[in-house]
Swiss-Prot record:
Biased composition (Low complexity): 302-318
Compositional bias segments (type: Polar residues): 127-139
Protein name as catalogued: Uncharacterized protein C19orf47 homolog
Listed Pfam families: DUF5577 (PF17740), SAM_4 (PF18017)
Superkingdom classification of source: Eukaryota
Keyword annotations from UniProtKB, A to Z: Isopeptide bond, Phosphoprotein, Ubl conjugation
Species in which this protein is naturally found: Mus musculus (Mouse)
Record keyword Ubl conjugation present: yes
Disordered: annotated segments: 108-158, 232-257, 290-336
Amino acid sequence: MGFRIGKNLLFNLRKAPGSRVKARKTMVSVTMATSEWIQFFKEAGIPPGPAVNYAVMFVDNRIQKSMLLDLNKEIMNELGVTVVGDIIAILKHAKVVHRQDMCKAATESVPCNPSPLQGELRRGASSAASRMIANSLNHDSPPHTPTRRSDNSTSKISVTVSNKMAAKSAKAAALAHREEESLVVPTKRRRVTAEMEGKYIIHMPKGTTPRTRKILEQQQAAKGLHRTSVFDRLGAESKADTTTGTKPTGVFSRLGATPEMDEDLAWDSDNDSSSSSVLQYAGVLKKLGRGPTKASAQPALTVKAKAASSATSTATTPKLRRLALPSRPGLQKKPDSLPKVSILQRLGKAAVVSEAQDSQVTSTKSKSSAEVKFAIKRTLVGPRGSSSSESLGAQMDHAGTVSVFKRLGQRTF
């Protein structure tokens, strides 16, 4: 391609001899541009043969150094660069060259002017002291050297050195940028572990404000703490005494008896309970289905009747004794077989009495002149115990004439 361009230029010079100067200038610029592009591709790492071809293509398509950042894969394919590795290397080197050109333009645009202080001192150097200060400043400051513009030849020679310097400057700029970012970022506080800090002190709300009271109520509802005592649920300050008193709960104590009577009753009840053969009231008209009772030391009921005649008193006493109450059902076992007992054996030997007195018993309310008086001696068996004399007196008062068989009950076989 380069030889064709040269032949075309020579052919044009022969045809137009008046334009030789212009052709020479264009040829010099083309050759310089081609050499620059060849050096560019060599620095990018492309072999010499493809580098010359790429340089000629860039010159033919009038690619300038200021267009390096506009290059991309599609444009490189249109220019004839199809190797992927060459495309990547050219694009990377294009960025580096663009940075170098920008740095050169920045350094050339800022000239090194002398300090304005020295000019002012020189202008106002009227006295000896001012002249001495100005001379000392001139001796201390280095002489100002004018900047020289680098030629194309020197730039070609120092391309590799400038590339290295540009890489170093880019690294330095990156480090400076990182340092600035680190300065901007706020410093993180060092974490303090629980062992270094110590135990936490948590102050719970005391319920002085409505909000804290509400929070405490919610916590208690969440925990589900239920009061286990009735007194806690009722709000009592102290529990009442649930133990019963040691006072006696007898009938006389509940009726308001005197302490002396209570002591007597307690002593009688102790004596009665100590005896093993205490008889209980079983009722006159009930069936006698149990065995014979034991004779008691102290009978539960003693009845003395006084009548007008001595015969009546001797007759009523054994009958009432024979009708004494049976003993407790749990104190003795029932016999296996009960013998048949006749009525006369159960009644015992009867005294010589009148027939009227054997067959009937008169009440105190009757019209007869005989008066029957009962002297009752009770023993306190228990709260459930009932007096047999009361039932007997009631029966004798209200019932007119009661036979012995009715009072003895039915016969047991």
